[in-house]
Amino acid sequence: MARITSEEMKERLAVYFIMGSQNSERPAEDVLKEALDGGVTLFQFREKGSAALEGEEKEALARQLQRLCRTYGVPFIVNDDVELAIAIDADGVHVGQDDEDARRVREKIGDKILGVSAHNVEEARAAIEAGADYIGVGPIYPTRSKDDANEAQGPGILRHLREQGITIPIVAIGGITADNTRAVIEAGADGVSVISAIASAPEPKAAAAALATAVREANLR
């Protein structure tokens, strides 16, 4: 499998949905199917937290959601768990600054998609050197979806990264909604990444569609 190109990666990052069983009171498969119907372009399985599944249950859910993504032709990314990603032949892995070293992850996963969380120019450059295909930058706005989230930085961090010569595809995360998507894209992000904006929405399909429309309209300006 050849490495994904930068242009392909940018397109995939448009509406990046992150979810685990702990993020919704409804069955994860139902929420994901509706989100995919609404226009999600990339999915990350993030099973973390005190209520998260483990072991065989975690793998079973991962495979279930992966099958759904394959039906829609949407890449399936695993958060942090490199061994699980390899075991189920996921399309890629995303790691944070406190997870396994990105360079080692790249060696393990070969040409699969590698995403790395970055909060500043130094971390962004390190991710690029490690072989990342994209970086996740945030939190842009305050968020309650992650217990360990850093302080919100605002869209200005995206603009700063671009001004410092960071050209790698960037997805913005943290408190993203359809209403603030335009500001994020105009500041330099290629796409938006959300958890609660879709997982907690009464209608995940409509929520995903609203984000997709917002990204598309922002890119036309």
UniProtKB/Swiss-Prot annotation:
Q: Which reaction does it catalyse?
A: 2-[(2R,5Z)-2-carboxy-4-methylthiazol-5(2H)-ylidene]ethyl phosphate + 4-amino-2-methyl-5-(diphosphooxymethyl)pyrimidine + 2 H(+) = thiamine phosphate + CO2 + diphosphate; 2-(2-carboxy-4-methylthiazol-5-yl)ethyl phosphate + 4-amino-2-methyl-5-(diphosphooxymethyl)pyrimidine + 2 H(+) = thiamine phosphate + CO2 + diphosphate; 4-methyl-5-(2-phosphooxyethyl)-thiazole + 4-amino-2-methyl-5-(diphosphooxymethyl)pyrimidine + H(+) = thiamine phosphate + diphosphate
Where 2-[(2R,5Z)-2-carboxy-4-methylthiazol-5(2H)-ylidene]ethyl phosphate is bound, by residue?
Answer: 143-145, 175, 195-196
Offer one example of a GO biological process linked to this entry: thiamine biosynthetic process
Q: Which GO terms describe its molecular function?
A: magnesium ion binding; thiamine-phosphate diphosphorylase activity
| General function of this protein | Condenses 4-methyl-5-(beta-hydroxyethyl)thiazole monophosphate (THZ-P) and 2-methyl-4-amino-5-hydroxymethyl pyrimidine pyrophosphate (HMP-PP) to form thiamine monophosphate (TMP).
Instruction: Report the family membership.
Output: Belongs to the thiamine-phosphate synthase family.
Q: What is this protein called?
A: Thiamine-phosphate synthase
Instruction: List the gene name.
Output: thiE
